[in-house]
């Protein structure tokens, strides 16, 4: 707990109404060449937001606009071909967060954010032991911002702050224990 050292149960402590806590439950399964997982997280006492400019604005502490709690769900999966070749291994993931606020001058409840990615990797690309890969996705971005967007003339349910992140890499297997992986990154909407 970030405020466990405060013994006043109205301001902190452990397992009190004012304590900040988090809990996570995850389940997963893996077969011989595939796997899938799901996760749920609840966090209380989240505090000020960080991230994209809109995320910071909607939970920045201005007028008491701190996020009080967040419920998060994530899903991920992967599949690998039984033999390497032209068919790549595939990894996918998606997550969503739903934010709730405490007492504030604005009603920002209803804020939500999401993220996703898709990754492809070709093993034994060009030379046995090397790998070529790419990934694309959107880092966490606001998909619904409740009343804070209405304050700025937005509809509150349109994705904002969305940008794409791309990565391309090639792994050179130098020895059995050493590999070198140069990569190129592209961000369509850097902070």
Language-model regions: role of each:
Residues 2-16, 47-65, 97-113, 143-151, ...:
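Outer-membrane beta-barrel translocator domains and adjoining extracellular loop/strand segments
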Residues 23, 29, 33-38, 45-46, ...:
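Repeated loop/turn-to-beta-strand initiation elements of outer-membrane beta-barrel proteins
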Residues 25-29, 75-79, 118-122, 168-174, ...:
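Residues on the lipid-exposed face of transmembrane beta-strands in outer-membrane beta-barrel proteins
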Residues 94, 98-151, 159-161:
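C-terminal structural cap/anchor segments
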Residues 145, 156-191:
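Extracellular low-complexity, Gly/Ser/Thr-rich intrinsically disordered linkers
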């Amino acid at each position: 707990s970030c405020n466990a050292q405060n013994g006043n149960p109205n301001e902190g402590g452990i397992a009190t109404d004012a304590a900040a806590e988090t809990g996570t439950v995850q389940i997963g399964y893996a077969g011989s060449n595939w796997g899938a997982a799901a996760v749920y997280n609840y966090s209380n006492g989240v505090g000020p937001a960080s991230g994209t400019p809109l995320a910071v604005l909607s939970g920045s502490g201005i007028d008491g606009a701190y996020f009080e709690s967040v419920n998060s769900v994530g899903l991920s999966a992967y599949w690998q071909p039984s033999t390497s070749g032209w068919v790549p291994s595939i990894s996918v993931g998606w997550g969503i967060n739903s934010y709730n606020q405490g007492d504030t001058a604005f009603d920002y409840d209803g804020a939500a954010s999401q993220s996703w990615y898709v990754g492809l990797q070709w093993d034994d690309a060009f030379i046995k032991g090397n790998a070529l890969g790419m990934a694309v996705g959107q880092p966490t971005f606001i998909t619904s911002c409740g009343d804070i967007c209405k304050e700025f003339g937005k509809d509150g349910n349109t994705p904002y702050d969305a940008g794409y992140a791309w990565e391309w890499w090639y792994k050179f297997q130098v020895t059995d224990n050493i590999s070198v992986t140069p990569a190129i990154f592209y961000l369509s909407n850097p902070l």
